[in-house]
């Protein structure tokens, strides 16, 4: 897999072009500001007088409605939540599309699963920072960047690579390194990582460890420190140095205990469950479930959020984070 760097990309394809960033959340703000500071012509499309309207104006952007931005722009970069994209696209973006324009995304969900079907003659590309928006902006301002992905679903103009690579350069991704992938690969691996490991698997492991210690009579504060708080130390070591050097940096006791006990926690059954989760992503079952959830106004999701917020680990964590100076009183 080839990695592209700053010297491989040029901004030329975007000169004299207008990029409309649709949405001004964490990624919308970071990507639009970075491209603007790279000398590209950026406008921001938002709901008229919505919460983000004044924020984008305060950041110096040319702000307009989504329809106005889509009409004006050559490249329309959609950065609103996945579950809202198709509805906004159909009502406010699709009528403004003309041959030669480019639709761009930072997640392939709606293109890969067919919720957005672009007309003929329109490029469809993806440029995705592999980092939260605040980090995308901060590292750019520091003169570096975060790694990213690019991919091309439809190359209607025969220069889609030049366009998406210029966007990656403008956002600052090629300063760190850019990998070319596909909409299918980006979408399915991203969803799997979120569900099985990063957001689903890790949080369930932390909760199970915390509850095991508390149920055995240990102080909740001690349980939190040992199963949640210190996780960042280990993740940072892995992030910076890899598994081998993480093991080198922890104590012999931790290394031996971890290596000899870990397979009893994440078992063959765990991996089988991961494979089933991946199948649900690949065959569209998860997507259908998520669409149905939206149709009932996220009732199940709201209930799960409420339950998570009432967990003992949340109450203990809030107190300890305040004690450690990590956040103000919640």
From Swiss-Prot:
Keyword Transmembrane found: no
EC numbers, comma separated: 1.1.1.86
GO biological process, one term: L-valine biosynthetic process
Binding locations of substrate: 251
Cofactor, how bound (note): Binds 2 magnesium ions per subunit.
UniProt keyword terms in alphabetical order: Amino-acid biosynthesis, Branched-chain amino acid biosynthesis, Magnesium, Metal-binding, NADP, Oxidoreductase
Pfam families (alphabetical): KARI_C (PF01450), KARI_N (PF07991)
Positions that bind NADP(+): 24-27, 47, 52, 82-85, 133
Reported cofactor(s): Mg(2+)
Function as written in the Swiss-Prot or TrEMBL entry: Involved in the biosynthesis of branched-chain amino acids (BCAA). Catalyzes an alkyl-migration followed by a ketol-acid reduction of (S)-2-acetolactate (S2AL) to yield (R)-2,3-dihydroxy-isovalerate. In the isomerase reaction, S2AL is rearranged via a Mg-dependent methyl migration to produce 3-hydroxy-3-methyl-2-ketobutyrate (HMKB). In the reductase reaction, this 2-ketoacid undergoes a metal-dependent reduction by NADPH to yield (R)-2,3-dihydroxy-isovalerate.
Protein name: Ketol-acid reductoisomerase (NADP(+))
Species the sequence originates in: Methanococcus maripaludis (strain C6 / ATCC BAA-1332)
Organism ancestry: Archaea, Methanobacteriati, Methanobacteriota, Methanomada group, Methanococci
């Amino acid at each position: 897999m080839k990695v592209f760097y700053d010297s491989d990309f040029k901004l030329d394809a975007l000169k004299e072009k207008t990029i409309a960033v649709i949405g001004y959340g964490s990624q919308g703000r970071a990507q639009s500001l970075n491209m603007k500071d790279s000398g590209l012509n950026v406008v921001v499309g938002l709901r008229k007088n919505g919460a983000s309207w004044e924020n984008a104006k305060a950041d110096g952007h040319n702000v307009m409605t989504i329809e106005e931005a889509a009409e004006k722009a050559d490249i329309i970069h959609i950065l609103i939540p996945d579950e809202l994209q198709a509805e906004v696209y159909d009502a406010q973006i699709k009528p403004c599309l003309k041959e030669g324009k480019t639709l761009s995304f930072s997640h392939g969900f709606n293109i890969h699963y067919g919720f957005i079907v672009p007309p003929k003659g329109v490029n469809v590309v993806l440029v995705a920072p592999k980092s939260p928006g605040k980090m995308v902006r901060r590292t750019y301002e520091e003169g570096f960047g975060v790694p990213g992905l690019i991919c091309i679903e439809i190359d209607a103009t025969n220069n889609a690579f030049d366009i998406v690579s210029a966007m990656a350069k403008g956002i600052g991704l090629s300063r760190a390194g850019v990998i070319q992938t596909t909409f299918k690969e980006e979408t399915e691996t991203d969803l799997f990582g979120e569900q099985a490991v990063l957001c689903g698997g890790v949080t369930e492991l932390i909760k199970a460890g915390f509850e095991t210690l508390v149920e055995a009579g240990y102080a909740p504060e001690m349980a939190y420190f040992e199963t949640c708080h210190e996780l960042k130390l280990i993740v940072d070591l892995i992030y910076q140095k890899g598994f081998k050097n993480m093991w080198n940096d922890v104590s012999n006791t931790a290394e031996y205990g971890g290596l000899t006990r870990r397979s009893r926690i994440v078992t063959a059954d765990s991996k089988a469950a991961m494979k089933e989760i991946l199948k649900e992503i690949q065959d569209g079952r998860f997507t259908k479930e998520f669409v149905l959830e939206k149709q009932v106004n996220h009732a199940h999701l709201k209930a799960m959020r409420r339950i998570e917020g009432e967990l003992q680990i949340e109450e203990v964590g809030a107190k300890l984070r305040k004690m450690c100076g990590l956040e103000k009183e919640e």
